[in-house]
Amino acid sequence: MGLRLSFMGTPHFSVPILHALLDAGHDIVAVYSQPPRPAGRRGLKMIPSPVQNAAQAKSIPVFTPQTLKTAEKQAQFAELAVDVAIVVAYGLFLPKAILETPRLGCFNAHASLLPRWRGAAPIQRAIMAGDKETGMMIMKMDEGLDTGSIALSRSIPITDNTTADELSNKLSHIGAELMIEMLSTLEKGQLKLTPQSGENITYASKIKKEETRIDWTKPAEFIHRQIRALSPFPGCWCNMNIAGREERVKILGSRLTKGPSREIGWIEPNSLIIHCGQGRIEITSLQKSGGKILDSAAFLRGARLSTVF
């Protein structure tokens, strides 16, 4: 017999864990997700989150409050009488009253090796920092920012070409496996929790808009990490001189290349090899504003480039 759960999550990253819990036979009596967001040019269409769509496809009741800080919303949550709340990239603050309501507690799946990269963007920050490994951790939540005691963890390597999208997909599925294992152990009364270390704490703040623009005076290795960390969303960008006209282009894929250096921003003829402040980088995937995502060969067939800036 499975546990009575509530699930709290918002992006695509959370969906495999929701599906895994259902497949394991747990009774998810309610799903919480952030409210639908406006989309389209005029913002007239409201788009539900991936988690809301997934829950509704399984006929699970969905709640999308703007906040959980009010007595009304906390009472509504208490009425669910859940054993455990599972939290995966929900994005809303859980006050003490919510944390203390489930019979066995609130458990969070976090995509880093805590206490490194506490906060909102652990996958992106790990890649941008050049970390060689990261992982997934299941922790019992407390009132701090990702400070809870650890129930389970698993580490994986970050290669020199791993993108945030690839890493997110891997960690999400690892998180699903760990969450099922954790709940099984918890249900048997055998779960052991380990407090986090007080050393080597770092914070993964949200990605700022200014961090998405490529500065070609930076080393090629730095730019390569930046592109990988922000691919596919929000994506890095730069301006390109295409047939004498300045155009904004989103850069979604790259690789480091060796060779002699030239002035910063120089593009090798018939290629997308760009010279940086130190070293060179080859752009492998990019997208003009309003256009399709293209590989470098397809892009070059329709563009005459001179410089980037």
From Swiss-Prot:
EC id: 2.1.2.9
Keyword Transferase recorded: yes
Pfam families in UniProt: Formyl_trans_C, Formyl_trans_N
Gene Ontology CC terms: cytosol
Residues annotated for (6S)-5,6,7,8-tetrahydrofolate binding in this entry: S112, L113, L114, P115
InterPro entries, per the entry: Fmt, Formyl_trans_C, Formyl_transf_N, Formyl_transf_N_sf, Formyl_transferase-like_C_sf, GART_AS, Met-tRNA-FMT_C, Met-tRNA-FMT_N
Lineage: superkingdom: Bacteria
Alphabetical list of SUPFAM superfamilies matching this protein: FMT C-terminal domain-like, Formyltransferase
Catalyzed reaction equations: L-methionyl-tRNA(fMet) + (6R)-10-formyltetrahydrofolate = N-formyl-L-methionyl-tRNA(fMet) + (6S)-5,6,7,8-tetrahydrofolate + H(+)
This protein's UniProt keywords: Protein biosynthesis, Transferase
Gene Ontology terms, MF aspect: methionyl-tRNA formyltransferase activity
The keyword Iron-sulfur belongs to this UniProt entry's keyword annotation: no
NCBIfam families: fmt (TIGR00460)
Family statement drawn from the similarity comment of this UniProt entry: Belongs to the Fmt family.
Function of the protein: Attaches a formyl group to the free amino group of methionyl-tRNA(fMet). The formyl group appears to play a dual role in the initiator identity of N-formylmethionyl-tRNA by promoting its recognition by IF2 and preventing the misappropriation of this tRNA by the elongation apparatus.
Descriptive protein name: Methionyl-tRNA formyltransferase
Organism this protein belongs to: Bartonella quintana (strain Toulouse) (Rochalimaea quintana)
Upper lineage: Bacteria, Pseudomonadati, Pseudomonadota, Alphaproteobacteria, Hyphomicrobiales
